Structures are given as structure tokens and as C-alpha cells.
Amino acid sequence: MEDIMTSLLVATSRVVVTISLAYVPVKSAFAAPQNAAGLCSAIAASSIPASRISLPTTGAKIQSATLIGGSDPANQNGEYCKVIGQIKPVDPKAPDIIWQVNLPSVWNGKMLQYGGGGYNGSIPPTTDKTTLGLDVVPTPLTQGYVTFGSDSGHQAPNADDASFAKNDEAMLNYGYMHIKKVLDVAKVLVTERYEKPVTRVYFQGGSTGGREGLTAASRWPESYDGILTNYPTANFVGLRLWGAGLARAVYDDKSAGWIPPKLVERISKEALKSCDGLDGVEDGLVGNMQQCRAQSAVLVQSLACKSDVTGNPDDCLTQAQIERTLKIYHEGYSLPYQLANGINTYPGYNSLEGIMMQLGSEPQMRTPPVSGPNAHHSSRSFEFLQNFVQRDQPLNLLSFDIREPGKLKDRIVELSDVIGATRTDWSTFSDRGGKIIWLQGNDDPSVSPLGNAKLFESIVAKMGADKVKGFMRFFLVPGLAHGGGRFSPTWDNLAALDNWVEHDVPPSNPVVVDATKSSTKGRSRPLCEYPSWPKYKGDGDVAIASSFSCADD
């Protein structure tokens, strides 16, 4: 497998050299002054040669270009040309990259790329608001941004399907290549449509889309000016290994580690009851997470079975559940080898601090595992190990040892660089004025908040706190899960990023509004720069951000 991947990467570098030497500016097929409808129609009849895409392809084709009228009752984004097309692969067996570019008739000179989710497989909603953006703020497209995104180079019925990764080109596209290929295509369309230069390029997304944003800025720092990244799967391979380790902890030895849903819910409620007031107010949110984690051992002891119980009781925790499942869920794991950028740990989750562990409704693991009935991470970890790592050989998830993966170790380490955003030196991006706003939820059950906090700390250790503060802001948000949660922070994040890039005005404890569909909808809190957290001042309306200050004690 490594030889195949290396061959493709070598071929990639050769094609890039050939493209750069052979590049000849292509005369526009649709640049003549026309009205918006005429320009959009001209795009439909065009194509983009491989020479205008900086990574290996066989060119891009336009599938359709449709002018969406500003008076269309189904359109709230103003008049724009909706362009859909394909980037054709080098390998004829690889899937196309399906993309969408939205060209507003009134353009502000800026572009916004949208990231995907899970294993992708479909185009993200490029006409919608940003991830965690305010509903009352006009969409980026309405504001005049060219918005665009892609399926990352394969088509799938859902974001859990990773079968595409058995093809090297499709796997590399998913890992990082689709990001730049689609940007290049979008820039060609922008140049030809408007005949004036792009002033700014931004990227926004959450989860996989958050990882893609960090990847974009770290791999092509000269191409991006600002990134909005939310709960990114930055250590993608580390997360997938954690899911495999969790599966063994839960389902090995006749599922001795499986915790029934009733007990999972009780753990969450007891933790919240114990920790809710540590930030000065009982509001359903745990702000002082550090102190809460310090109390976790007491919580476990209070829920432990009083006698040597076996099986999976729903009223107390057995030793197997404590020593296996809770240990890896709460503390994570360490490896005797290093992934990309020297990482050999994956910290756990706030599983004893109020989040709902996702351990599935069934005590036995299905073959293959399925999210919902089985632990959430087990299914995506199986998909990763089967399709990215093992590929053609059947995989037994419960026999896979993340610490001793044998002959698969080199492949795992290699993939951690291909599909990951854990680099710690951002000097090139920061030196040219690039900015990053990064949100991570403390209640996230899918991406470890401790892991992303540790990555941020590594960036600070590498570059120095003052330099990092000049281009990156990292906010840990109480109550935010993997999107949604007990507190869903929404704000005009694109305006905050643009203001920082354009005017060098960084976001300073910005106010976010809870969009959770519950009785608490509309309450506000300050975003606090890590490691600080929102602490109630002791008086004032608990639903208003001004009643809180950012504390780190």
C-alpha cells in the first residue's frame, strides 16, 4: 500500500512541474461585457484545462450554470450564478470531485470556501450561513462573497461511508488535495466572471470542515487570508485510533465494558449536578471544567457497585466498566510510537463532567458496527481502518490493537500526515497576515476538547504566546457539543474574521447567543480565550453576557 501511495505522490510532483512549465494564459470564453444572465450562460459553455489547476487533474468541466434571480421566492441570497461542475481525476478509476461555485451579481471582491463533514461525499450547503453563524445576519452570499465547496472527491449516500479511500487519488483528495483543486477552479471562474482580482480568500467549517480549514492554511498559507474553524478533527487518525480502542474496551470480553443508556444518563446528570455551580451559577453549563475534572474520581466512587458485580447493571458501575470504558473515554490513550508532528497521545473527553457518552443502545457490536446501536466512534473507526489502512483484507475491529498495530503501523503514521492538521509552526501564514478563529466545545462527544486544547498549547510552545495571539484565537465553549448541545454559540463570526484581517481588530471576548431550541434560547455569554472561562460575577441577569467575566482561577 505504501508503494502505491508513494508512486502516486511522485507522479503528482511530476505533473505539477509539467503544468507549471507548460502554463499558458487561457483567453476567457465568457469575459466579454454582458448582463448577468449572459455571463452565466457563457460559463455553462466553458471548461477549465488542467494547466489552470495547480495539482494533478485532467481538467474541470462545467455541468450547469444557472442564474438564480433575486426575486425568486425560494432564494434569499440575492441574484447569483450557481455553477456546478466536476474536476476530472488523473486515475480513470478515481471519482470526480463535484463542486459548486456561487457567483453573486454584486461581488465584494472576497471568496469563502465551505468545508464538509464526516467522510464527506456531498457538496456542503454553500448558500447557507457560516457554521455557528447568526441566523439574523445575511448569508455570506447575500453579502457579496463568492461561496464555494465540494464533495471532496467522491460521492456517497452518507458521511459515514469511507469505501472511497481504497482508491489512492480519492483518498488523497479527501485528505487535502480537493481543497486547493477546488480553490483553483473557483478562482478561474471568478477571474473570468468579474475581470478584477480577488482581495481575500477565507475558509469556514466545522468537524471535518474545521480540519479542512486548518489544512488549507497550513499547506497553502499563501492562498488563504483567514480561517473559521469549529471543533476540527485536527488529529484525525488519533481520533480514529481512539474509537478503535474504545470499541475493544466496550465490547471485548463479552461486552463487559458496555454501560447501559440509563446509567450513561445518570452519570451525566450526577456530574452536571456536582459541577454546574462551580462557575458561580447553576445554569445547566459547566464553566469551570478544570475543577470539575478534579472531582471525577469522587463521582466514579459514588456510582461504583458495592459488591463484585458482573454483567452490565444499569444502577451502578462495575470494575470492568470503570477500568476499561471510563478510563479510555475520560483519559484517552498513549502510543509507543509517534504519529505526524510527534503526537503519541489522544486525550479523552469530559465524560465525567456532564457530557453524554455515546456507547450505543445495544450491548453487542454489530458486524460491521453501526452508529446508534453501537458506540458512535466504533463505526467510523472501522470505516477508517478497513478502507484507509487495511483496505482489501477483512478487518476484525476487536482484534486490532492500537498500541501494537504490527505491519500496519507505518501506514497509520503516514496517513496521520496526509489526513491531519496538527502542524505547530504557522509562521508563513501568520507572517503574511493570516488569521484563525477557532471554537471548540467542552461538551463535544465526537472530537476531544482536551486534544484540541493540547494542540493549541503545542502551537503556543512552538511559536510563543505573543506571536500566536497575533494571528490565532482559541475559545473553549461551555455547553457546546459537536454543533448544538446545551449551549449553541452563534455570532457574526465572518464579520469578526474579516475585521481582524482587514483592520487588524481581533475578537476580544465577543458575545455569543445561544441558538439551542429550548427555554434557554437567546441567552448570551462571552467567548473566553483559552484557558479562561465565563464566570458569573455574582449579580445580574444570568441570561446576559455582561453578568459574566472571563476567569482563569
Curated annotation (Swiss-Prot):
<keyword id="KW-0732">Signal</keyword>
<feature type="signal peptide">
    <location>
        <begin position="1"/>
        <end position="31"/>
    </location>
</feature>
<dbReference type="Pfam" id="PF07519">
    <property type="entry name" value="Tannase"/>
</dbReference>
<keyword id="KW-0479">Metal-binding</keyword>
<keyword id="KW-0106">Calcium</keyword>
<feature type="binding site">
    <location>
        <position position="283"/>
    </location>
    <ligand>
        <name>Ca(2+)</name>
    </ligand>
</feature>
<dbReference type="InterPro" id="IPR011118">
    <property type="entry name" value="Tannase/feruloyl_esterase"/>
</dbReference>
<feature type="binding site">
    <location>
        <position position="276"/>
    </location>
    <ligand>
        <name>Ca(2+)</name>
    </ligand>
</feature>
<dbReference type="GO" id="GO:0046872">
    <property type="term" value="F:metal ion binding"/>
</dbReference>
<feature type="disulfide bond">
    <location>
        <begin position="275"/>
        <end position="292"/>
    </location>
</feature>
<feature type="active site" description="Acyl-ester intermediate">
    <location>
        <position position="207"/>
    </location>
</feature>
<feature type="binding site">
    <location>
        <position position="279"/>
    </location>
    <ligand>
        <name>Ca(2+)</name>
    </ligand>
</feature>
<keyword id="KW-0378">Hydrolase</keyword>
<feature type="binding site">
    <location>
        <position position="281"/>
    </location>
    <ligand>
        <name>Ca(2+)</name>
    </ligand>
</feature>
<keyword id="KW-1015">Disulfide bond</keyword>
<feature type="active site" description="Charge relay system">
    <location>
        <position position="482"/>
    </location>
</feature>
<feature type="binding site">
    <location>
        <position position="285"/>
    </location>
    <ligand>
        <name>Ca(2+)</name>
    </ligand>
</feature>
<keyword id="KW-0719">Serine esterase</keyword>
<keyword id="KW-0614">Plasmid</keyword>
<dbReference type="InterPro" id="IPR029058">
    <property type="entry name" value="AB_hydrolase_fold"/>
</dbReference>
<feature type="disulfide bond">
    <location>
        <begin position="528"/>
        <end position="550"/>
    </location>
</feature>
<comment type="similarity">
    <text>Belongs to the tannase family.</text>
</comment>
<feature type="active site" description="Charge relay system">
    <location>
        <position position="444"/>
    </location>
</feature>
<dbReference type="GO" id="GO:0052689">
    <property type="term" value="F:carboxylic ester hydrolase activity"/>
</dbReference>
<protein>
    <recommendedName>
        <fullName>Uncharacterized esterase Atu5261</fullName>
        <ecNumber>3.1.1.-</ecNumber>
    </recommendedName>
</protein>
